[in-house]
Amino acid sequence: MANRNLSESLFKPRQKHQETSTLVKHRDPRLIAGNYSTLDGNSHGSWYRMINRLMWIWREIDPFEIEEVLCRIAMTNAQRSDDNLLDTVIGYRKGNWVFEWSHQAMLWQQRALQAEQIPEASNFWLKAANLYSIAGYPHLKGDELSQQAVILANKAYENAARCSGYQLRKIEFKLKEGGCVTGFLHLPQQLQRPSPTILVCGSLDNLQSDYYRLFRDYLAPLGFAMLTVDMPSIGYSSRLRMTQDTCILHQQIIHQLDEIPWIDHTRIGLFGFRFGANIAVRLAYLESKRIKGVATLGAIVHEWLSSVERQQNSPSMYLDMFASRLGIYNVDEKAFRLELGCYSLKKQGLLGRRCSVPMLAGYWQNDIFSPKEESKLIAMSSMDSQLLAIPTTPVYNSFNKALREISQWLRNKVC
């Protein structure tokens, strides 16, 4: 009942909220590029958001449920901020992206409250958490409805963990500039001693709660604990902004791991997804004595950040997401591209230098955000490296196999 009341109080009718696609302003007209990326999904001319079926299904959202929600959004006649984009319905009502995904989450939340078996309740809460997270996607700063969905996602996630066989600890990490940031420490079952730990550096469009399956199915069976933290400007890190020192948040966390009794701070590995790989690789150079291994998947460390052509061919949502993380809301295209180039680890003078930390770089052929050259650059920079090519078909099985190979590689390097 308390959770239902929280949902009602957060989403009660108010004045019109600013629609997500209008939060970042561009001086030049934008084109909705039609592209496909294995790790990020499809970008269609009729949708503002990228439709990321692979990752949503991997997070155990039923494919039919995904299509049902998308259909409800597409079929509405409600007012849109852009009549050409289906997911731009204004206000919290039927057809609005946050409304429809949150409505779906509430159905699972209700089932969780009525569940008679604890494992069943945990599974239902986790589904609710994932659906609330999708409701907030792509988590742009200033999106009030998205922020409300994130609150519910975190609440549902904590309820899921409370009902599961694993332990979830909320850890407060102190920041040099004052205040704290909250991370989730996931601990394996029957913990008897401090665990080797993987710090996940997530992609810019995901909450830290989106990686539970990575822990449950891949890391925990190998004896790992998993530590997550939200990327700057979203979730528990919403008041922070991404800077050219991309790893500053995660670096401060690494310096505090020796204070956490459940973590073996002498056995720490990193797993970086997309732009999270930028953070992980940067940390490998700056904290080489504290890190035993770094794995990356679809890394964004140089090519996309430096290529005007790649950026021009990228979906509008993706550019808006980067601008939002950097705290840019009125975009001058030329200045924005110059700013993105400053985040290249090669231009920063790091990538290309030999690094003592073992690194694995996984990639998909013809990835619009992370070409093979990106992963080769990472592999060539480490004295102990592996390049992992991931087949594009069958997409789900290949992704699952890659995660198992990467997890085993981390075990060999970290444990």
Curated annotation (Swiss-Prot):
InterPro entries: AB_hydrolase_fold (IPR029058), FrsA (IPR043423), FrsA-like (IPR010520), FrsA_esterase (IPR050261). Belongs to the FrsA family. Catalyzes the hydrolysis of esters. PANTHER family: DIENELACTONE HYDROLASE DOMAIN-CONTAINING PROTEIN-RELATED, ESTERASE FRSA. The keyword Heme does not apply. Its EC number is 3.1.1.1. It comes from the Bacteria. Signal peptide: none annotated. Residues 1-23 are annotated as: Disordered. Keywords: Hydrolase, Serine esterase. It catalyses: a carboxylic ester + H2O = an alcohol + a carboxylate + H(+). It comes from Photorhabdus laumondii subsp. laumondii (strain DSM 15139 / CIP 105565 / TT01) (Photorhabdus luminescens subsp. laumondii). This is Esterase FrsA. Pfam families: FrsA-like (PF06500). GO terms for molecular function: carboxylesterase activity. It is an enzyme of class 3 (hydrolase).
